[in-house]
A protein has these predicted regions:
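An N-terminal boundary/leader segment
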Residues: 3-80, 293, 309, 316-318, ...
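Structural helix-boundary/capping segments
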Residues: 13, 63, 141, 192-198, ...
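Generic hydrophobic alpha-helical segments
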Residues: 39-43, 83-86, 186, 388, ...
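Glycine-rich, small-residue loops and helix-cap segments
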Residues: 46, 57, 101, 141, ...
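Short, conserved phosphate/pyrophosphate- and ester-handling motifs at nucleotide-, phospho-/glycolipid
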Residues: 46, 107, 247
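Long amphipathic alpha-helix in the N-terminal Rossmann-like dinucleotide-binding domain
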Residues: 77-87, 143-144, 153
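Immediate post-signal peptide segment of exported/extracytoplasmic ligand-binding proteins
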Residues: 86-102, 250, 280-290
Length: 510
């Protein structure tokens, strides 16, 4: 097992004097709501101050961040200035936005103008983008207050947030265990109460899997509904951005704010922003919920039991359970680990020490390239670059990458047949609950299997989301994954809201 790095997170904070101040005043703002919807409603109505909301969340960060390490950077000064602007808008009678005063954490692979964006990699340590990602712009326009950049597996390559150059992010539910990945910092930030909302990216399950392991809601929307402009690319045909939240309504609220066409992203779907909140109370009566009969096996019994409980809850709410087949689903993991590394090997070629980021000086240009990339990239990133380069090489392209693309099409065809019979599909999000830190670090194949249920929807470009649905082994959260056809977010959120209501009725937390 490799040594665990517990980074001194103060290195990444813009301000050092706020920690003691916030710890001292940690209980001052105990009346702050926990959901983004309630916070925004209170700020807009004038019953809450955005600056008070922010200070309450900074106090929570000060109290627990040292144990969790959700953040690479907490942008205290910028957040306080943004919160003050929201309060000024309210006082002046201006519309502060639908997310007025809501603290939001951003995964550290999204460009933030003048604020470090590292992708948790030494090769980009200290790099400050000259522009904001479209999602960052839209959140700011909606009145959200960005509070920092969250930790991730380097360049979003991993399933545990152990592959960060800046240390491990620990699970707030049990700090001896992983938070999932690659958006583990974003999931942990919401689970720990550092922010009611965070934004992650999802290439093969990197929002949904950590959401399941941390017991929060995580959404990967349809490919192209949320702009990727300003997202540092891992695998461009698979990457998508989406929210984490403590409840379903908050994720709907955020998706409405960040979705919609963006001319800066050539893959952006030319459509209006998603409209989701109005469907949350509609129920699932008459909906067809698909059970995949040939789904890959191997999920823990506790996880399977919670999936069956979810089917029972939806049936009790009026849905019909139907069996569907996905014969190509068992090949999704193999296809993904050819396609994604192939795209990564191309996308990461730009980090060469010439234009930006780390440069290791050497005797000639080729030696500088090699030394820079050797020093700047971590082991998992190197592994995937080599795998992708091999798969794209002239002698092996047809045997590996070409076949993977054919499998990708077969999986899309399987989904099309399944959605002819069912409105949504239900699967586990992760085959296991959160595992101990270091348990799978030396076994990449075991780590890759954590995404066996999330990868297929990325290959097809469809929406999917994870909702917490009880607990499994060791009292740890279990997530259920809802899959829907392209642009099927409304029916997906109907089902999510129904599952959430059934958990509340049974006495479980949202």
């Amino acid at each position: 097992m490799r040594p665990l790095l517990k980074t001194d997170v103060s290195v990444f904070r813009r301000s050092l004097d706020w920690t003691a101040e916030m710890t001292t005043n940690a209980n001052i703002h105990s009346n702050i709501p926990t959901t983004a919807f309630a916070i925004a409603d209170g700020v807009r109505s004038g019953t809450l101050k955005a600056v008070d909301v922010l200070e309450a969340h900074l106090a929570q960060i000060a109290a627990r961040e040292g144990d969790i390490h959700a953040f690479n950077l907490v942008t205290v000064d910028e957040a306080r200035a943004a919160a003050a602007r929201v309060d000024a808008d309210v006082a002046a009678g201006r519309d502060p936005g639908v997310l007025a005063g809501v603290p939001i954490a951003l995964k550290d692979n999204m460009c933030t103008r003048g604020i470090p964006t590292t992708c948790s990699s030494k090769i980009l340590e200290g790099w400050r983008p000259p522009y904001d990602a479209t999602v960052v712009q839209r959140l700011a326009a909606a009145g959200a207050v960005a509070i920092g950049k969250t930790n991730l597996d380097e360049f979003a390559m991993g399933s545990s947030t152990e592959n960060s150059a800046f240390g491990v992010t620990f699970n707030p539910r049990d700090i001896s265990r992983v938070s999932g990945g690659s958006s583990g910092g974003s999931a942990a930030a919401v689970a720990a109460g550092f922010s009611p909302i965070s934004i992650g990216s999802d290439t093969g399950g990197s929002i949904r899997q950590p959401a399941a392991l941390c017991g929060v809601v995580g959404v990967k929307p349809t490919y192209g509904t949320v702009s990727r402009y300003g997202l540092v690319a891992y695998a461009s045909s698979l990457d998508q951005m989406g929210p984490f939240s403590t409840d379903v309504r908050d994720s709907a609220l955020v998706l409405e704010a960040i979705s919609g066409h963006d001319p800066m992203d050539s893959t952006s779907i030319p459509q209006a922003p998603l409209s989701l909140q109005h469907v949350l109370s509609q129920g699932v009566e008459g909906l067809r919920v698909g059970r995949i009969t040939d789904m890959p096996s191997g999920a823990d019994p506790d996880v399977t039991a919670r999936l069956e409980a979810a089917f029972d809850a939806l049936k009790a709410a009026g849905a019909t359970i139907v069996d569907v087949e996905m014969p190509s689903m068992k090949y999704a993991l193999t296809a993904y680990y050819l396609i994604a590394p192939a795209e990564a090997s191309s996308n990461l070629a730009r980090y060469d020490g010439v234009r930006y980021g780390l440069r290791v000086n050497a005797t000639d240009t080729n030696a500088m390239y090699s030394a820079t990339r050797t020093a700047g990239f971590g082991e998992e990133v190197k592994r995937r670059i080599m795998l992708g380069t091999y798969a794209l090489s002239a002698g092996y392209y047809d045997a590996y990458y070409g076949k993977a693309l054919k499998v990708r099409r077969l999986i899309s065809d399987d989904f099309a047949r399944a959605y002819a019979k069912a409105d949504v599909l239900l699967t586990p999000t992760s085959p296991i609950v959160a595992f101990p830190v270091g348990e799978k670090s030396d076994d990449p194949l075991a780590m890759y299997l954590c995404d066996i249920y999330t990868i297929p929807t990325n290959l097809a470009g469809h929406p999917a989301m994870s909702v917490p649905f009880g607990t499994g082994a060791h009292g740890l959260p279990v997530g259920v994954q809802i899959l829907a056809p392209t642009l099927g977010e409304q029916v997906m959120f109907k089902v999510a809201a129904s599952l959430e209501r059934s958990m509340i009725a049974a006495g479980g937390a949202k």
